[in-house]
From Swiss-Prot:
Identification of the protein by name: Guanine nucleotide exchange protein smcr8a
Localization, UniProt: Cytoplasm; Nucleus
Location of region: Disordered: 272-298, 418-454
Assembly and oligomerization: Component of the C9orf72-SMCR8 complex. The C9orf72-SMCR8 complex associates with the ATG1/ULK1 kinase complex.
GO biological process terms held by the UniProt record: autophagy
Entry GO CC: cytoplasm; guanyl-nucleotide exchange factor complex; nucleus
Gene it is expressed from: smcr8a
Biased composition (Low complexity): 421-432
Boundaries of every dDENN FLCN/SMCR8-type domain copy: 762-826
Segments forming domain uDENN FLCN/SMCR8-type: 47-219
InterPro entries according to UniProt: FLCN/SMCR8_DENN, Folliculin/SMCR8_longin
Residue ranges, compositional bias (Polar residues): 280-298, 433-454
Keyword Cytoplasm: yes
Native source species: Danio rerio (Zebrafish)
Length: 853
């Protein structure tokens, strides 16, 4: 009988440690193996096994002396390439005869012919190196090279194969533009080199001709020396004809390329810009330029060409920069740097950005509110809307220092990156992004603004009798009043204008405590449909309703427009027929105070995103997100300030320190609707009294508090327009504005937010503002809530609008934001981005409260 020790001896050692196996557990063959952890390993990207850290652009050449070699990388940081073998990869991408171009003596031709072959585009991959590349082959011309050609290629190298394949069309388009720019500069340099070589050959021919004549005179016509000189002269003559034919070919290239579709597209994509220095030229300057050009052309000294040239491997080949014109070469590098930045990052991010741009381009009706304007938007705007007739034309490239045979040589690539001119509709207003101070007020021109008038036709006050003025003083109170600023006359006299048609209901008296200027009357030609809706002789003690074709939800909406005519001056107005209260008003108060404009020279300013002549970028707005995040955490009344900006109420930031004021402006400008490409609706620093037209133009103003006569006038303007603006005193940490009760802005600006990065908070703001814009778009174009059922029943329109906004989930205060955005969308839809129509100036008869920390 076998005992227990023998049984134990025949058992396996592992059987004693077996635990119970769960039958419901996942089998091993279906389990995912763990990722092998390494120092810089990333399981979510294919660059983990590549020898370079991020994508880059490689420019290589197939040199006839040393073979394929890398020339430069973009970016030029050696850390980007890492241990990646550039020489090996250059050999891979340059080892194929990709174009099979023929340059030599074709059949039936005595001279070499330049074949302008098209670029080739291929995709190569090296799984061993973990690199995939989009390769763009091109040919440049060099007079000293074999066959006059120098093969080059530009490659976008990435570790993500899907990025190369899915973005092939975009890469091909961008690299084609860079290649065309590089080849245009090369053709220009090649033509210059041909001209110089022709001068050398002609000089050599003249020298050889003289020497040949001397040999004939001394040794006879059949001497050895004379025969050698004659053969050498014949070779020079042949070379001259060949170089002239090459020059003819290279200069006739653009005329053929202009018929190509790609060339036309490349030419059309250039913005119509022109250097400001080219506008104002006089005959003397042009004469000097002509003399200078002629001196440059004659500055080259011809050289004698030796009979035997250097060997192929003894001569020095030109570098890529020497093969091209300097300006074209630098422009090509800028384009390639832009390509590298645009395709940088993950494929998902690039694809999402492209979808975003495509969607934004289709939503131009609302994208102007909070989205950054792009170059393609400018191009679209220039096609859809009118362009000023005085725009300068695009200058043709002037190749100074070139022979006369190159005068017809043109190209589709502009030489310089010229800054866009500050034109109407294209750039910022004259004073929108520049700082306005009173430092050089004595040298500035004085501007005198008139009072408010109607936008209709104007004639003298004699058509209105004084009795009708006094009797019907309160008659014809309309639910909406239109105010316009008359244009400046030569004598700068102010006027009160009267409408064309006489009516008993065209004169409205405004309460001195709540009228726009507290200084005059508003004359309006009443509408026919409202002729029977005039009020009685009662004092205005309640807020008026809105006009029929206006927005009834807005309590009062004034439209400021420029009138081409001037009305009656104050000297012609008989104030005895007016009421006693109006007669006591100082006449000087009717005139807007003179503004003195100058460029501030203060050097101790804080960093501001507003730079004159440059567009605001998304990067600057992301930086402003950090300032906005800090603002809502430091100021408890941040929601009230943001509510004023979103509802169209001008916010004035008052302070002594310019740096503090600019920081607050920088924190709040991302909440301003219709900011503009250049920040036209924001004035970061103002040291003069602002006017009513400034409130119409600027929605965020940084105002200087100064202890001076200018400071007292600034405080006077604040008190004068205090009912129509909100004032944030950064010195006393107070805010005077109407109250806000709602939940929309509490989600937008919550001081308890867990967001810590400014860029993240900017994306949060952008998302919520986009949602708000979508609701405003829906409110604007839902026609059934704006069209009245009956012309006499306007209450139904107001109730339908109110119910519609309530269904969207907005309170009364939040509805004001939707209505203001809706008005901006209407104006943009009618007038376009050219901003032909003036924006509306709206305010509410509500009480302002003082908020303190």
């Amino acid at each position: 009988m076998i005992g227990s020790p023998d049984v134990v001896a025949f058992t396996k050692e592992d059987d004693f440690g077996d635990s119970f196996s769960d039958p419901l557990s996942l089998p091993d063959e279906f389990s995912v193996p763990l990722f092998t952890h390494a120092a810089n390993a990333n399981p979510w990207t294919k660059t983990s096994y590549a020898k370079f850290s991020k994508d880059f652009i490689l420019i290589s050449e197939f040199s006839e002396q040393v073979g394929p070699q890398p020339l430069l990388t973009i970016p030029s940081d050696p850390k980007v390439c890492g241990t990646f073998d550039l020489n090996y990869f250059s050999l891979r991408i340059m080892s194929v005869d990709y174009q099979a171009s023929f340059v030599g003596h074709p059949p039936g031709s005595n001279y070499p012919k330049l074949n302008f072959v098209e670029d080739s585009k291929v995709v190569l991959g090296d799984s061993k190196e973990g690199a995939f590349a989009y390769v763009h082959h091109l040919t440049l011309y060099d007079l000293e090279a074999r066959g006059f050609v120098r093969p080059f290629c530009m490659a976008y190298i990435s570790a993500d194969e899907r990025k190369i394949m899915q973005q092939f069309q975009e890469l091909s388009s961008e690299f084609s533009k860079a290649s065309e720019c590089l080849k245009s500069g090369n053709r220009k340099a090649f033509a210059n080199e041909l001209e110089k070589k022709l001068k050398d050959l002609e000089y050599t021919r003249s020298v050889l001709h003289k020497e040949t004549e001397l040999q004939k005179m001394n040794n006879g016509c059949y001497s050895t020396q004379a025969i050698e000189k004659a053969n050498e002269l014949a070779n020079v003559e042949k070379s001259i004809y060949e170089h002239k034919d090459l020059l003819r070919q290279i200069t006739s290239y653009p005329s053929r390329r202009k018929r190509d579709v790609d060339f036309v597209q490349c030419e059309a994509e250039k913005p119509p810009v022109m250097d400001e220095t080219l506008k104002d030229t006089n005959p003397s300057d042009s004469a000097e330029n002509t003399v200078e050009t002629e001196s440059r052309k004659s500055s080259y000294t011809p050289q004698l060409i030796k009979a035997k040239s250097a060997k192929c491997f003894d001569k020095r080949l030109k570098t890529l920069e020497e093969l091209c014109d300097t300006s074209f070469f630098l422009q090509t590098l800028e384009q390639l740097n832009a390509v590298e930045k645009s395709f940088r990052g993950d494929l998902c991010f690039i694809y999402t950005s492209q979808i975003d741009r495509a969607l934004v381009s289709k939503q131009r009706v609302t994208s102007f509110l909070f989205e950054a304007e792009h170059d393609w938007e400018d191009g679209g705007a220039s096609k859809n809307f009118s362009i000023p007739s005085n725009n300068p034309t695009i200058p043709i490239l002037n190749f100074s220092g070139e022979p006369l045979s190159l005068d017809s040589y043109t190209t589709c690539i502009d030489v310089d990156h010229l800054k866009p001119g500050v034109e109407s509709g294209e750039g910022p207003p004259e004073s929108s992004t520049s700082d306005i101070t009173q430092e050089t007020s004595e040298a500035a021109d004085t501007e005198t603004k008139g009072s408010f008038s109607s936008d209709k036709s104007i004639e003298a006050l004699g058509s209105v009798s004084p009795s009708s003025l006094q009797t019907n003083f309160f008659d014809g109170l309309e639910r909406r009043s239109k105010i316009s600023i008359p244009s400046y006359s030569d004598n700068a006299s102010s006027s009160i204008a009267v409408p064309h048609r006489r009516s008993d209901g065209n004169l409205v008296q405004m309460d001195a405590a709540c009228c726009i200027g507290q200084d005059g009357f508003i004359f309006e030609d009443p509408l026919p449909e409202l002729a029977q809706e005039c009020c009685g002789d009662t004092v205005v003690n309640q807020e008026p309703l809105s006009l029929l074709h206006g927005d009834p939800a807005l309590q009062m909406d004034y439209i400021l427009e420029e009138s081409p005519n001037m009305g009656l001056t104050f000297s012609e107005l008989n104030t005895s027929v007016l009421s006693e209260e109006v007669a006591k008003i100082n006449i000087e108060d009717v005139f807007d105070r003179t503004s003195f404009m100058s460029i501030s020279t203060s050097s101790d300013r804080a960093v501001s995103p507003f730079t004159y002549g440059s567009a605001l970028t998304v990067k600057q707005k992301k930086k402003a997100g950090h300032s906005a995040l800090r603002f809502i955490r430091q100021y408890p009344f941040a929601q009230q300030a943001i509510s004023c900006l979103l509802s169209g109420r001008t916010l004035v930031i008052l302070g002594v320190d310019e740096g503090t004021v600019r920081k607050l402006v920088n924190a709040l400008f991302i909440f301003v609707p219709n900011l503009g490409k250049y920040g036209e609706t924001v004035q970061p620093w103002l040291s003069t009294p602002f006017q009513l037209t400034d409130l119409q133009r600027w929605k965020l103003i940084g105002l200087q508090r100064a202890v001076s006569p200018a400071g007292s006038s600034i405080l006077h303007s604040l008190n004068r327009y205090s009912r129509y603006i909100s004032i944030l005193d950064c010195d006393n940490k107070t805010l005077r504005c109407p109250p806000y009760k709602g939940t929309l802005i509490s989600h937008l600006a919550d001081h308890r937010t867990q967001i810590k990065r400014g860029s993240t908070y900017f994306l949060h703001i952008q998302g919520m503002l986009t949602q708000l814009t979508a609701k405003a778009f829906l409110y604007t174009f839902c026609h059934h809530i704006h069209l009245p059922m009956d012309i006499n029943d306007q209450g139904s329109v107001t109730s339908r609008r109110t119910n519609f906004l309530l269904q969207l989930g907005y309170t009364v205060e939040e509805s004001k934001i939707i209505q203001y955005l809706s008005e901006l969308i209407k104006q943009h839809y009618i007038h376009g981005s050219a901003k032909v129509g003036n924006p509306s100036f709206s305010f509410n008869y509500t009480t302002s409260y003082l908020y303190k920390i």
